[in-house]
Regions:
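Transmembrane beta-strand segments of Gram-negative outer membrane beta-barrel proteins
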Residues: 23-68, 102-106
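One-face residue pattern on beta-strands with alternating periodicity enriched for small/polar residues
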Residues: 32-40, 85-93, 153-155, 218-220
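Flexible glycine-rich, low-complexity coil/linker segments exposed to the extracellular/periplasmic environment
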Residues: 51-71, 260-276
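Glycine- and aromatic-enriched membrane insertion/assembly motifs of diderm outer-membrane
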Residues: 70-110
């Protein structure tokens, strides 16, 4: 892990609120369209270590076989560039009388560094993506790291006041997260973790990512009922489940083969590939 951290340097990171439109409307309406542009350039500052991708003393090990594709994907040629990523986050909100409205947001990205890989063509015995040649990325890696986009939030909401109580309802793709956890694993594997899958790919490899980009919205119906000043009832029903997102197999920040659904083979002791 120490060598992995030392092997990466942030050369430049730029984030700017490129456009923030507040539309002129009547007092009852609020319409906003915000766009954030973020650019990152990263480079590895150390060359590939043989003991990392071949195991100790030059002997092949399971750990090396499962993790070699990541470090071999970027060498020190071309300044050892790991990423030249451009991100755009667009958010559109329409609110009427602060009580009703909708929100839709989406993100898009382009990273020329993931157009191809530096993985050598002579290491087929531990290559985890045989559907493409070493030196290329699979379809899943290209979609997630090279060029792509996705819808994030897409929901409607309403708030009602009933006497001294209030009821809030949201329907559609949105994020909720209840409470805190004393242990780190509780935030991931507990009730809160089940509500909002995390985009660990962005957390690990895209500096400057905000929480609203890391917690992935899912389709659900949620309510908040304020009974008294000291009592609030919350409920939700989820219509879909999303997996936690990890860096794809063969990319620089991938921790190991076999952790994503798009891994085709995992290499175990003796360098023998195993179909997953």
């Amino acid at each position: 892990m120490k060598h992995k951290l030392l092997a990466m340097s942030v050369l430049a990171a730029i984030s700017t609120q490129a456009q923030a439109f507040q539309f002129d409307t009547s007092d009852d309406w609020e319409i906003r369209w915000d766009n954030t542009v973020k650019a990152n350039i990263m480079s590895r500052v150390e060359k590939q270590r043989r003991d990392v991708y071949e195991g100790g003393r030059g002997n092949s090990t399971t750990a090396a076989g499962l993790a070699d594709d990541a470090t071999l994907s970027v060498d020190r040629s071309n300044l050892g560039i790991i990423s030249t990523r451009l991100d755009v986050l667009s958010e559109f909100d329409v609110i009427w009388k602060n009580d009703f409205g909708f929100r839709i947001s989406g993100s898009a990205w382009y990273d020329h560094a993931y157009k191809d890989s530096d993985h050598p063509s002579d290491r087929l015995d531990t290559w985890a993506t045989p559907s493409v040649k070493p030196g290329e990325y699979g379809d899943a890696a290209e979609d997630l790291h090279y060029f792509g986009g996705e819808i994030l939030d897409a929901f409607v909401f309403g708030n009602w006041f009933i006497g001294d109580t209030s009821l809030g309802v949201r329907a559609g793709r949105h994020t909720i997260y209840w409470g805190n956890s004393l242990l780190a694993t509780g935030a991931i594997a507990g009730v809160g973790g089940a509500m909002a899958p995390v985009d660990f790919m962005k957390a690990l490899s895209v500096p400057g990512s905000e929480a609203k980009e890391l917690f992935r919205p899912t389709a659900k119906l949620s309510t908040v009922f304020q009974v008294t000043d000291n009592l609030t009832l919350n409920a939700y029903y989820s219509f879909e489940h999303e997996r936690y997102r990890l860096p794809e197999t063969g990319t620089y920040f991938s921790p190991a083969e076999g952790l994503t659904e798009d891994t085709e083979f995992a290499t175990f002791i003796g360098g023998q590939p195993f179909r997953v």
